[in-house]
Amino acid sequence: MAQAKKKSTAKKKTASKKRTNSRKKKNDNPIRYVIAILVVVLMVLGVFQLGIIGRLIDSFFNYLFGYSRYLTYILVLLATGFITYSKRIPKTRRTAGSIVLQIALLFVSQLVFHFNSGIKAEREPVLSYVYQSYQHSHFPNFGGGVLGFYLLELSVPLISLFGVCIITILLLCSSVILLTNHQHRDVAKVALENIKAWFGSFNEKMSERNQEKQLKREEKARLKEEQKARQNEQPQIKDVSDFTEVPQERDIPIYGHTENESKSQCQPSRKKRVFDAENSSNNIVNHQADQQEQLTEQTHNSVESENTIEEAGEVTNVSYVVPPLTLLNQPAKQKATSKAEVQRKGQVLENTLKDFGVNAKVTQIKIGPAVTQYEIQPAQGVKVSKIVNLHNDIALALAAKDVRIEAPIPGRSAVGIEVPNEKISLVSLKEVLDEKFPSNNKLEVGLGRDISGDPITVPLNEMPHLLVAGSTGSGKSVCINGIITSILLNAKPHEVKLMLIDPKMVELNVYNGIPHLLIPVVTNPHKAAQALEKIVAEMERRYDLFQHSSTRNIKGYNELIRKQNQELDEKQPELPYIVVIVDELADLMMVAGKEVENAIQRITQMARAAGIHLIVATQRPSVDVITGIIKNNIPSRIAFAVSSQTDSRTIIGTGGAEKLLGKGDMLYVGNGDSSQTRIQGAFLSDQEVQDVVNYVVEQQQANYVKEMEPDAPVDKSEMKSEDALYDEAYLFVVEQQKASTSLLQRQFRIGYNRASRLMDDLERNQVIGPQKGSKPRQVLIDLNNDEV
C-alpha cells in the first residue's frame, strides 16, 4: 500500500511540473518581445523626429505633454523594459516617484509658458494639430501640453497661481525623495545643515571685513595722533595774518615773467624790495654780459695759444655748392624677380615643412635685391628650433645656395627664411640717397636697401662709431667709398673734416686734394698711430673749450658761437665734425698695436660729444685685430660675408654673416639694436667717385692742418746700437725678410745672448714686429724702402 501511495504522489508531481512548464511556455510568448522592440523603435523615431512617423509621434507627445515629453519618452522606455523582463506592471516606490515627477514637470512647463505668453483658452484637436505641425514642419511651444493646460486651468481657481507654484515645488521635492529613498526628515535636516553652514561662513566673512575696517580706522587715528604730536613738537610760528607788511607768499623774482612786474606796480609797500630785485636783475644781466665777454676772450686766447684746426685759415666758402646727385649714375632697369616663381617656392617651402612634421604657413613674402624672405607662421605647439634644424633640408628643397633662418623675426610671431634670388639686383648709391637728399644731417650716409627694398640711410653722429669687417671681395671697400661720398654730397668743407688712414695705399688715395681733408691720406702705419694720437689731442682741446664755455657737446658749443657772432658781430669759426676712417686695422695692429688700441679706445669712449666719429674697417676679423676693448666701445657694426661663424661672432656677436652671399650683402647692427638688419649694399663705381672728387676739388683746394700731420718716422739707419754687428744684422734681416735668434746665430756665428740682444734692438727700432708665440716675427721694412 505504501509503495502504491508513493507511486501515485510521484505521478502527481510530474503532472504538476508538466503543467507549470506548459504555463511558462505560454507566458514566454515572443509577441511580448516584438511589442517591446516596436515600442522602443517608435520612441527613438519620436525623440529624433525621424521621418513622417517620428514627426507624428513627437507632435502627438508634444501636444499632450509639451516640454515634459522628453521625460515621458524615458519613462515609457523604462516601463517597457521592466514589463518585458519582469512580466508584471511596476508597482514600486520609484514608479510613484516617476509619476509625481512627470506631473511636477507638467506644472513647471505650463507655468513657464503661462508667464511668457499667458493662458490660452482653446486647444486644437489632436489630429488637426498633428497634421498642422507636420505640414508646417515646425513644433510650436505648447508649454505643458494639453495635460498641463487643464491641470493649471483647474488648479488656479482652487489654490491661486501662488499656490500652484508651492504645490509644484512640493511635488518636485516629493519625487526626489521617492526616487532616492530619502525621508522628508533627512532631506530637511541636510537642507538645514547646509543653510547653517552657509550662514556661518557668511558671518565669518563679515566679521573679518569688520575687523579689517576697524584696523584701518585705528591706523588712521594713530597717524593723525602722530601728526598732531609732530606739529606740537615743532616751534610755534605766528599766524600769517599777524604780519601786516610781509606777504603771504615768498617774493622770488622770476626774470622775464610778467606777473612779478605787475605785482611790483600794484604794491607800493614793497618798493624797496622791487628796487632790490631790479638792481639784482641788472647785476645779473651785467654779469652775464661780462661772462660772455670773458668767454669770448677765453675762446680767443685758447685759439691763439694752441695750434688748432681753425688756425689753418679755414674760411667758410659761401660760393661752395655740394655736388649734385646727377654726378652719380642712373640705375639701369633690371629684370624683377617673378612673383609666380616666388609663390611656387613658398608652396614648396610649406610642403617641405609639412613632410618633416612641421605645421606652418607662409604668411608674407618680401622680395629684396639679393634675397627673398618668407615669413612662416608656425602652428601652436611647434618649436622654433625644429624649423631651424631643417636648414639644410629647406636649402635642398628650394635648390638654393644657402638659406638663412631668422627665428623669430624681432617683434613678430613669425620665423623668417631668407632664400637667395637667382640674380642679385644692383643697388646704386643714387637711388638710396635720392629720397633724403639733401639731408639736414650732414653726417647722413647711405648703406643700401633692406629685404623689403626700402632705402637705408643712417646718421654717423648717432652710431657714433662704426666697425666694418668682412673677407676680401665682400664689398667692404665699396661701403667705405659710399660713406665718404655720402658725406661729400651732404656737407661743406667747413662743416665736416675727414682723416683717412689707408695702410693698403691704393683704396683712398683718390681723395687726396679734397678740401674736406685735415691732412693728406695717411699710408704709413707708423704715421697712422701718430695721427690717431693727434685726434686724441684735438678731442681734449675741444673738451677744454666746452668746459670754458659751459656747454656739453659740439652742438651746444656751435649754437653758442653762432649766438655770439650775431650779438657781437664777430666771425668766430664753428667746430667742424671730424670723421676718422681707418681702411685696414689689421696692418696698424701689427705695426703699433698697443698705441693704436689705446688711441682707438680713447676716441671711442669720449669723442662722441666732441663731434669726432671713428669708422674702422678690416678684412681679418680675428680677436687679435678686433680686440675686446675696441669691440666694446664701437656699438655699431657692419658684417660682410665671412668664412666662419667664429668670425661672425667676433664682428656682431652672433652668427649669420657666414651665410651672406658677398657682393655687398651685409648685416647691420645699429647702436642699441638687438637684432641685425640685412642690407644689400649700395654700389659705387670708381668713375662716380672720381667725378664727385673732381667736382669738389674744382670749387676749393685742400687746406691741410700742419699741426695735425704726424711726425716723420725716425730713420732706422741713424739709430745706434751698442753691438757692432747691428748694421749687418739690420741689412741681413731686411734682405731675407725674416728674423729669428737662431738665424742670427748661424749667420754671424755668435752666441744666443748676443743674438737675443740684436733681436731686441731691431724690435725697439721697429725693424721687426713683436714676438707672437711660435709664429715667425714680421719684418716691417722692405727692400723698396729708401732708408735701406
Swiss-Prot record:
Protein family according to the UniProt entry: Belongs to the FtsK/SpoIIIE/SftA family.
Protein name, entry field: DNA translocase FtsK
Topology with respect to the bilayer: Multi-pass membrane protein
Location of this chain's protein in the cell: Cell membrane
Domain notes: Consists of an N-terminal domain, which is sufficient for the localization to the septal ring and is required for cell division, followed by a linker domain, and a C-terminal domain, which forms the translocation motor involved in chromosome segregation. The C-terminal domain can be further subdivided into alpha, beta and gamma subdomains. The alpha and beta subdomains form the DNA pump, and the gamma subdomain is a regulatory subdomain.
Regions that span the bilayer: 34-54, 63-83, 99-119, 137-157, 158-178
Pfam families linked to this entry: FtsK_alpha, FtsK_gamma, FtsK_SpoIIIE
Basic and acidic residues: bias regions: 209-231, 253-262
Residue ranges that the UniProt entry lists as topological domain Cytoplasmic: 179-788
SMART domains (alphabetical): AAA, Ftsk_gamma
